Amino acid sequence: MSLALTLGDPAGIGPEILLKALAHLPSELLGQFFIAGTGQVLEETYARLCQQGQVAIDPAQLQLWEHPLDEVIVPGRPSVASGTASFAYLKTAIQRAIAGEVAGIVTAPISKACWQAAGYSFPGQTEVLAHLTGTAHVGMLFLGRSPVTHWVLTTLLATTHIPLQAVPRALTPEGLNEKLALLIQFLRERRHLERPRIAIAGLNPHSGEQGHLGQEEVTWLIPWLAAAQQQYPEVELIGPVPPDTLWIGAADAWWGRPAPATAYDAYLALYHDQGLIPVKMLAFREAVNTTIGLPFIRTSPDHGTAFDIAGTGVADPQSFLAAIAWAQTLSKGSVFPLTLA
């Protein structure tokens, strides 16, 4: 199964983590990867990493979909040019995936601010993927495999890149139905779980405390959950669970502790930070962002551009390598180890 890998913002750590990650894979597998990027950026990154004594793959060994730059990109200095380039890399990879040239895409981090400065109004890569593929409903799902127990943390966000004050208005039974359907389909088709157990977080502290700390649970979330359970009798839906205790069982399963709390096959978080705080606390190096609902696989490391360390040689490629491994696994290709050799 071939994959497209993007450089992300070339002023960030994307070029570095890509070259480091591919250096840890068997050379006979390199023919499966196509890089959407700029050769000059890769060559300069490789030369710098060699001077810094870092292990990286020579870009000459890679298959490149070249996008030339009009301006010089300096590591750690985000610009309109770097935003324009990162959007072009992503667009190329999407077009190639739509054409069936690759089974999936692994995207390095981009800067939303640079996209805005370059004239692109999309809030993130997920939204671009949905737009260019004509996909009405997609989900932002995070996967992390424990290096201790191999248990997989699976968390779907009901809402994504919106202000916290907009979350209650954005949450609707119809929207949750769409996300739940995507999650169940993913668990069955990609994780082979026919009767999954899915926990749904509450919105308010203590899930509203019977309406004393917020009305959303009482007025529509609990009724929606009851209706969803009737619609999916073969799936166990648990909730709304108070958010401050929901992921305790996940932590026990992650670290292999005796588990008085329950770990679930998947978690549905109602807003961005509610889901990503536990994900990043447990699985910052292992977590992968997966877009579900697309006609092809898309994964991404669960971190940003890290402009502050770009060019220093200290960026950790583990999450990018995990994103490659998950993309291969989910596209039913070869399974790579999820930890660096």
UniProtKB/Swiss-Prot annotation:
<dbReference type="GO" id="GO:0051287">
    <property type="term" value="F:NAD binding"/>
</dbReference>
<keyword id="KW-0963">Cytoplasm</keyword>
<comment type="similarity">
    <text>Belongs to the PdxA family.</text>
</comment>
<dbReference type="Pfam" id="PF04166">
    <property type="entry name" value="PdxA"/>
</dbReference>
<keyword id="KW-0664">Pyridoxine biosynthesis</keyword>
<feature type="binding site">
    <location>
        <position position="206"/>
    </location>
    <ligand>
        <name>a divalent metal cation</name>
    </ligand>
</feature>
<keyword id="KW-0479">Metal-binding</keyword>
<feature type="binding site">
    <location>
        <position position="126"/>
    </location>
    <ligand>
        <name>substrate</name>
    </ligand>
</feature>
<dbReference type="InterPro" id="IPR037510">
    <property type="entry name" value="PdxA"/>
</dbReference>
<feature type="binding site">
    <location>
        <position position="298"/>
    </location>
    <ligand>
        <name>substrate</name>
    </ligand>
</feature>
<feature type="binding site">
    <location>
        <position position="280"/>
    </location>
    <ligand>
        <name>substrate</name>
    </ligand>
</feature>
<keyword id="KW-0560">Oxidoreductase</keyword>
<keyword id="KW-0521">NADP</keyword>
<dbReference type="GO" id="GO:0008615">
    <property type="term" value="P:pyridoxine biosynthetic process"/>
</dbReference>
<protein>
    <recommendedName>
        <fullName>4-hydroxythreonine-4-phosphate dehydrogenase</fullName>
        <ecNumber>1.1.1.262</ecNumber>
    </recommendedName>
</protein>
<feature type="binding site">
    <location>
        <position position="272"/>
    </location>
    <ligand>
        <name>a divalent metal cation</name>
    </ligand>
</feature>
<keyword id="KW-0520">NAD</keyword>
<dbReference type="InterPro" id="IPR005255">
    <property type="entry name" value="PdxA_fam"/>
</dbReference>
<dbReference type="GO" id="GO:0005737">
    <property type="term" value="C:cytoplasm"/>
</dbReference>
<comment type="pathway">
    <text>Cofactor biosynthesis; pyridoxine 5'-phosphate biosynthesis; pyridoxine 5'-phosphate from D-erythrose 4-phosphate: step 4/5.</text>
</comment>
<comment type="subunit">
    <text>Homodimer.</text>
</comment>
<comment type="function">
    <text>Catalyzes the NAD(P)-dependent oxidation of 4-(phosphooxy)-L-threonine (HTP) into 2-amino-3-oxo-4-(phosphooxy)butyric acid which spontaneously decarboxylates to form 3-amino-2-oxopropyl phosphate (AHAP).</text>
</comment>
<feature type="binding site">
    <location>
        <position position="289"/>
    </location>
    <ligand>
        <name>substrate</name>
    </ligand>
</feature>
<feature type="binding site">
    <location>
        <position position="161"/>
    </location>
    <ligand>
        <name>a divalent metal cation</name>
    </ligand>
</feature>
<dbReference type="GO" id="GO:0050570">
    <property type="term" value="F:4-hydroxythreonine-4-phosphate dehydrogenase activity"/>
</dbReference>
<dbReference type="GO" id="GO:0042823">
    <property type="term" value="P:pyridoxal phosphate biosynthetic process"/>
</dbReference>
<dbReference type="GO" id="GO:0046872">
    <property type="term" value="F:metal ion binding"/>
</dbReference>
